[in-house]
Amino acid sequence: MESIPAQTNYRVGERDLKYYIFDWDDNILHMPTYIHLERRLANDTWVPHLVSTALFSVIRNDTANYRPPEGDWEKAFVEFRDLATDDISKFLVDARLALDRVLQGIENAPPSFETFRKTLVEGRIFAIVTARGHCSSTLRRGVEMFIERVLSAAEKAEMLANLRGYVAYYDGEDVNLAKSDAEILSDYLALNKYHAVTSPQFRQLVEGVLPDPDRSEARKQFAVRDFVEHLFNIIERIGAKRPISVGFSDDDPANVHAVEEYIRTELARRFPSVRFVVYDTSDPTLEKGHKIVVSGQLDLGLD
């Protein structure tokens, strides 16, 4: 990260407590990562067929015409894993390509691109919850790449000023002054959650906890709950007494519906003081997606 003079925005300590949960693919970035399937032809033979994540969300239940190679979903999603043979994660390679296409004006950014950018600049705590199978550290490196390549020098300075403001407000000015910009940024990134819900790491987290751990929707529900519990642990530690809101955005209607129902039936009852808002970003023509207020009254300010 380029050198930026350290400043502190002391006003951030009075902000509302707004937090965000983002799906990655086709929500933050259109990743050039493909799912390896087989497609049935008219003569009942099967041929290899590469599918984008956007198309897969539409055809994934069409088992009559699409199937994984040799019936093995691991082979279908090989590009969505961190492999020991890779010098650099396929996720990071594809993230760089996807960012290039947006920054060069080749394609429009997905619906949550600018919201994610704003979240980083404001120094808000967030979670990445994706159906990918990468390590959490890989997702974090993707966020670091986004910060480095997307944020302008002025936005990076504003982000650091906001982060220093939070540190000064909650941990004290001595702690703020003792830390370098690199340490401030690293501490912030460590506060966030990076859940790739088909990764071996995440499977260990849900094993014995979820009755149906193989369902992507169930894993995303668990990841959302884990993040909200994480937030409340932080809020209790710092003793903040302000309105709390959590926004969730995803481009897959099945995930949107599953999380919306989970919030209504479980999280809204457990956390009645929180305003939960879900954004369905499956329609790329809607700039920030279709907004669904699930519970609470506080405006997230994303309209």
Label every model-predicted segment:
Residues 1-2, 302:
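Non-Sec secretion/translocation targeting segments of pathogen effectors
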Residues 12, 16, 120-127, 133-303:
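C-terminal cap/substrate-recognition subdomain and adjoining C-terminal extension
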